[in-house]
Amino acid sequence: MSLDKEIHSLKKLAAQYSQQLDLTHLALPNASTIVHPNIQCAIYELMFNEAAAWPLPPVGYRTRVLKTIISRIEEGITDPEEDELNSDLIETWTDLISLPKPSQIQQAQQLTYIKYTAPTTTTSQDPQTVITSESRGLIYSSGTTGFRTWEASLHLGTYLSTPTGAAHVTGKRVIELGAGTGFVSMYAAKYLRPQFVLATDREGTLIENMKGSKARNGLGGEFGVGAWEWGTPLGYPTEDDTESITREDLCFDVVLGADLVRDVSSFILFGILGSTGLMESRPMTQTYFLCFSLRFMTFLITTRPKSSFSQLHYGTRRLSRRFWTLVGYGVDYFADNNRFKAVCLPYESPQTENQTGFFHETEIPIRTYRVTR
């Protein structure tokens, strides 16, 4: 591989680093390549230069990554008189090891900015990025899983980054349920040219978190945030959230959802959706993304244009016991019992080693369902 191509390949490494992947998953150049002065310079500019690389990961993560990089460079040194460490990298390392380090508990509970980069299909394509505020440790103390972006959300984002996926959103009025960090909604609003996107969640802290992320991503009136406790009517966002969107325009064509459930019993969601105004009148489509283990589910729904937020309320319905005990009944069976038609779409995310953005594990398959009624 030529030096220019090697430098270009560092953009993938920088995207993985900004997403704060585990060190074992970083696509580091080999020792004979990383020792080259131009490669070291590019690594500094893309990953550690505070004036150019924003947002930077937490100090602890940067320190671990840079330590690994320096060790790899040292492995590649064959002529001490010719090969040397980049002075900017050395200075950065010196600064990092002198900074105070929070405890592991503090690190786990602190929110940090994470930058996600969309998959790229050409070398000249400008990167599409979304910045969220997350803590992958807060799920244990907060009682919600919404403080991090999970694999199924990244799978959904990957699907939406394709021409087929983007077509579901372009020009449409979109709402996301259980938005969590807002990753999917913000990506759709920022790059897929929808008419409007509303991200909803039940947790007040997550709502405030998404409002802050809205500003960091430069989003305006095309993106709003609202609260929805399932089992109650969906409240209208405040004027500050909707900005130029009028109340009459707050209806939608597409509903997105990712990682909404954690076990098969939560297929009650079909019953919830089936008893709302969301499912009235003309035929509509739904697409469900489902982990093979049934621990997480995502979906995309297209509904009639006149469905408004005031119609979003539901009555619970009791499940048959077999839904709680027999995984084999799954989406198809439960959809049929709520008068849906579920068809599995032939879409899979690229294997982890072939991904160019929205990096996520693929060991547990996430199946894509198109559900119509």
Ranges and model annotations:
Residues 1-373:
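S-adenosylmethionine-dependent methyltransferases
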